[in-house]
A protein has these predicted regions:
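Short, Lys/Arg-enriched N-terminal segment that forms or immediately precedes the first helix
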Residues: 1-9
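Amphipathic alpha-helical dimerization/coiled-coil segments
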Residues: 2-3, 90-117
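Short, contiguous hydrophobic alpha-helices characteristic of membrane insertion segments
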Residues: 9-10, 58, 66, 116-117
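N-terminal helix-turn-helix DNA-binding core of bacterial DNA-binding proteins
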Residues: 10-53
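Basic, amphipathic "hinge/linker" alpha-helix immediately C-terminal to the N-terminal HTH DNA-binding motif
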Residues: 77-96
Length: 117
């Protein structure tokens, strides 16, 4: 049986925006490092998002009007929180549905049996 300790960056890159949108739809607002740690925790370390991958995606989602930002001073640090806009909430659902359908198609294509969870 194949065991992958961490998924390839190519696989993650294609789903990163959807991952971010999904997390923000469940958590209202999050800051960048919090997003990376949440993904790492939820996937038992199989998906580790680097800052170099995350922040360009966050900025792209913000430029697309899907995210809004708010900065807060935490001690001597400035922390930037991201949250979904109304449009972002709608697009999040579309992206999640699209990815779910894609995974089901890949499962069929590769003749895989659904995993028991």
């Amino acid at each position: 049986m194949y065991h992958c300790p961490m998924y390839s960056s190519e696989l993650i890159k294609g789903t990163l925006k959807t991952i971010v949108l999904k997390l923000l739809s469940e958590n209202q607002e999050m800051y960048g490092y919090e997003i990376t740690q949440k993904v790492k925790d939820l996937t038992a370390g199989k998906i580790q998002i680097t800052e170099g991958a995350l922040y360009p995606s966050l900025h792209a989602l913000e430029n697309e009007g899907l995210l809004s930002t708010q900065t807060m001073n935490i001690g001597k640090r400035v922390r930037k929180y991201y949250s979904l806009t109304k449009k972002g909430k709608s697009v999040a659902q579309e992206k999640i549905s699209e990815l779910t359908d894609f995974m089901n198609t890949m499962r069929f294509l590769l003749d895989l049996k659904p995993s028991a969870q």
